[in-house]
Amino acid sequence: MNAKIRHCAIWSDGCERSARFYETVFGMRFFTAQGVAERDPTNRSRGQLSDGVIGLALNPRPPGYRSGLDHFGFQLQDLGKVSERIKQDYPDTLFTKGLEGVAFAGLRITDPVGTHIDIAQKGGANLRGGYSRDEGWEQPRHLHHIAIRAKKPALLAEYYQKVFELTEVKILSGEGGICLTDGKSYLLIRPCENYSYRSMTQGLDHVGFKVENLEAVKKELDNLEKSFPESAPRKILVGRNGQTLQRDIDSCSLGQYAIADPDGVLIDLTT
C-alpha cells in the first residue's frame, strides 16, 4: 500500500501526566528528542511516544484549542502522487505546509468531514527521530484503530480508499460503520447519531489499543491511580451525559472495554 498510518496527535493540558499514562499502561516509549528545542524557545514539546509503529504527539494546548484528539498522519511512498490525486479528485481540499521543527512534517490537509491529516514522504529530510527510520519494534500493546465520525460513512470511506489506497475489512465493518486498513492498523468510520451532541459531531472520535489481557490492564490502571493520581484515567460515567457517552463508546464494533486518558480522550481496548 502507498500509505501507512504513522502519527496521531493530542492537545494536552498536562503533557507529563499524559505521557506517564501512555508509558505505564501501554508501554509506549519516546522515539523523538525530549526537551525544549534550543533553536525555538516556543517549542515546548516533550518528545513523541511510539508503540513501535505509530508515533503519539502530546502537544501543550494553546489558547483557542480544545484538549483532545487533534489530527493523525500518513507516511507515503509517493507524496507527490497522492497530492496530485487529491487535487484532481477532491479539489476543495485545504492544503498547508507542515510546521517547521516538528518531528512529522510535510503537508497538512483536511478530509471531506474536516479531519486534519498530516501527510509526509517516507524517508523525507523533514522527518525526525523514529519517523526517519524504517525499523520500529513489536510490542503486545499498541495502537489498533483510529475512529472518525461521519454523516455519510460510505462517502468518507471512498475518500480514504481512493486517496490512500486503504482496503475495507468487511468482517470488522458493521452497524453502519466501515472499517479500513493499511495492512497493519485500522481506520474505523462510524456513523453520526442524533442521541447526543457528541455523536452528532463529524471528525475524530476515539482511538483504540490492542492489549494482551484486559484484566491485567485494569489492575495496572488501579495501581496507576494510587501511585500517580494525576495520571489516572478520567471517569466516563460521570455527570448527566455519562451514561450516554458510555453507551456510545461501548457500541464501537472494534472495542471491548472503554477508558479515557487524563485529558479525556476516549480509548477502546481490545484483545
What is each of the regions a protein language model found here?
Residues 1-19, 69-72, 122-157, 174, ...:
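N-terminal beta-strand motif that seeds the catalytic metal site of vicinal oxygen chelate
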Residues 1-55, 100, 105-108, 147-188:
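Core segments of cupin and vicinal oxygen chelate
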Residues 4-13, 47-48, 61-139, 171, 179, 222-271, ...:
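Vicinal oxygen chelate
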Residues 53-57, 66, 114-117, 184-188, ...:
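Short, charged/polar, Gly/Pro-enriched secondary-structure boundary elements
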Residues 59-61, 130-135, 193-197:
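Short beta-strand/turn micro-motifs at beta-sheet edges
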Residues 154-233, 237, 242, 247-249, ...:
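Structured core of small recognition/catalytic domains
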